[in-house]
């Protein structure tokens, strides 16, 4: 019922204690972490702590092994697909930051969980009868306060502050609103009435764009109108925004934060920007169809699905990714 280090403390990089980590209520920034929380913590919080520990990923690995055996996955005359999302590491990163002992420990434990799963597949399915694609949906920013302590520009931009600045600017020019319905991280959503005016006159939102652009931590502010058509833009920021844009779900105005600035005050750190550290993730393949090696050609998590599909001669013509042919056995 306690999460402690898998290895000795000397095998971890950096100090365990950090003034910048925002541990969840019931925990501190120091190992060990009782899954029951501190004394007086409601028993129901056990599941919250368990989910935000490496033990949830270990459980998922055991459950996957059970599914393979129970449903004879990979052991029949058919192609089976098993998708797993090891999300415990994400929670740990949000709570303690990417340089913490907790993240290092979660990675070490996840490595063991994967080793056990692959060993089971080798013995149950056969080493030459399965292929694995492993990646991540995002990277992570360092803790802004830790970066700022090194003399580097960093900080937090809060949704409420963006909304206040945007609404004040729009009211000053266009009269009493409301004009802004919601600010959600990098997305600013206009009210229905304001959106109707913006569709008729793209310059309508300019007061908001100008005001938010002057805020600390803001790199760019621009309209999302027609953004879905700019996926091939030479501008890396615009292209990244376009790749993540959905015309029916995304905001009317996109706010891009400067490097090392994040848009939340409720967790130690987060992700979700166009910055390289948020896009830098591994793309790893395992199995007989693949050549061992490290490849320096550009790749993306979007390439995993078409590459795996190619193994069963299935094409994905509308996929964003490509088949990573350089990694395949000829």
How would you name each of these model-derived features?
Residues 85-87, 136-139, 320-324:
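Short, solvent-exposed turn/loop segments enriched in Gly/Ser/Thr/Pro and often Arg
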Residues 53-61, 103, 107-111, 197-205, ...:
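Solvent-exposed, acidic/flexible segments
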Residues 1-23, 101, 112, 116-261:
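Secreted, luminal/periplasmic, and some membrane-associated catalytic domains
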Residues 149, 157-200, 270-312, 328-330:
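Substrate-binding rim/cap in mid-to-C-terminal beta-strand-loop elements of soluble/periplasmic
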Residues 50-76, 89-130, 205-207, 211, ...:
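A long, amphipathic alpha-helix that forms part
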Residues 1-78, 87-94, 214-220:
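His/Asp/Glu-rich, glycine-adjacent segments
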Residues 47-73, 77-83, 88-90, 256-258, ...:
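Extracellular low-complexity, Gly/Ser/Thr-rich intrinsically disordered linkers
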Residues 314-330:
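C-terminal beta-strand edge segments of enzyme domains
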């Amino acid at each position: 019922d306690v999460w402690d280090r898998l290895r000795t403390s000397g095998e971890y990089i950096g100090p365990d204690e950090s003034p910048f980590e925002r541990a969840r209520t019931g925990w501190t920034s120091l190992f060990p972490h009782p899954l029951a929380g501190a004394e007086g913590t409601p028993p129901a919080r056990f599941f919250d702590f368990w989910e935000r520990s490496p033990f949830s990923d270990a459980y998922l690995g055991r459950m996957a092994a059970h599914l393979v055996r129970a449903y004879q996955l990979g052991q029949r005359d058919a192609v089976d697909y098993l998708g797993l999302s090891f999300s415990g590491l994400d929670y740990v990163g949000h709570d303690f930051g990417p340089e913490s002992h907790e993240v290092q420990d979660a990675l070490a434990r996840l490595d063991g969980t994967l080793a056990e799963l692959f060993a089971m597949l080798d013995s149950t399915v056969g080493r030459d009868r399965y292929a694995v694609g492993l990646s991540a949906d995002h990277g992570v920013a360092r803790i802004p306060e830790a970066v700022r302590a090194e003399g580097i520009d960093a900080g937090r931009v809060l949704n409420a502050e963006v909304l206040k600045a945007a609404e004040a600017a729009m009211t000053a020019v266009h009269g009493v609103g409301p004009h802004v319905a919601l600010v959600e991280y990098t997305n600013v959503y206009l009210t229905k009435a304001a959106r109707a005016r913006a569709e008729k006159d793209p310059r309508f939102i300019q007061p908001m764009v100008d005001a938010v652009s002057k805020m600390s931590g803001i790199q760019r502010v621009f309209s999302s109108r027609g953004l879905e058509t700019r996926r091939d833009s030479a501008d890396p920021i615009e292209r990244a925004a376009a790749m993540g844009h959905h015309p029916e779900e995304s905001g009317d105005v996109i706010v891009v934060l400067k490097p090392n600035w994040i848009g939340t005050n409720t967790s130690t750190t987060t992700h979700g920007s166009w910055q390289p550290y948020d896009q830098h993730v591994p793309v790893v393949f395992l199995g007989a169809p693949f050549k061992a090696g490290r490849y320096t050609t550009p790749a993306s998590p979007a390439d995993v699905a078409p590459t795996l599909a190619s193994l069963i001669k299935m094409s994905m013509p509308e996929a964003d990714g490509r088949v990573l042919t350089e990694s395949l056995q000829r």
